Design a protein with these regions (language model features):
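Conserved PRPP/pyrophosphate-binding segment of the phosphoribosyltransferase/PRPP-pathway fold
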Residues: 1-113, 120-155
Length: 155
């Protein structure tokens, strides 16, 4: 994906606005937006978190707040590219947690989790489970694209 792997940050505003439009019903009911976090090492190497960029644009378009501290990636995982569904699930198992300082941003709140691409759903499920364990009342997921089985077409 050009945004994530091609440093095409110029694509983020358009992508974020499309996501805000497509997810307007989810966002209308949400208390806050949570981007899928990167492990600090991956963010340092990439220099940005594409999900956080999209979340900021979506928040601006929808009038919602982004809670960057609500969810942390506590385990450095290998990239998911090329992994099957069960390998992806195993890869992110235990990778996400609501930190003590993020509890207030989560407890009792309706959250919308933001990511760029949904492939197997393993990352979204891992994040949603962590947020629900952390006290969120509900978690919806909003992504820019979904990979369909058998397809490797560029997005």
């Amino acid at each position: 994906m050009p945004l994530k792997y091609g440093d095409r940050l110029d694509l983020a505003p358009t992508m974020g606005r499309w996501m805000a439009n497509a997810g307007r019903e989810l966002l209308a009911d949400a208390d806050a937006i949570v981007p899928v976090p990167l492990h600090w090492r991956r963010q340092w190497m990439r220099r940005f978190n594409q999900s956080a960029l999209l979340a900021e644009i979506i928040a601006k378009a929808s009038g919602r707040v982004v809670t960057h501290g609500a969810l942390k990636r506590v385990k450095a995982t290998p990239q998911q590219v090329g992994l099957g569904k069960s390998e992806r699930a195993e890869n992110v198992q235990g990778a996400f947690r609501v930190p003590a300082e993020g509890k207030a941003e989560v407890t009792g709140r309706k959250l919308v989790l933001i990511d760029d691409v949904l492939t197997s759903g393993a990352t979204a499920e891992g994040c949603a489970r962590a947020l629900l364990r952390g006290g969120a009342s509900s978690v919806d997921v909003l992504v820019f694209a979904r990979v369909v089985a058998g397809g490797r077409a560029p997005i």
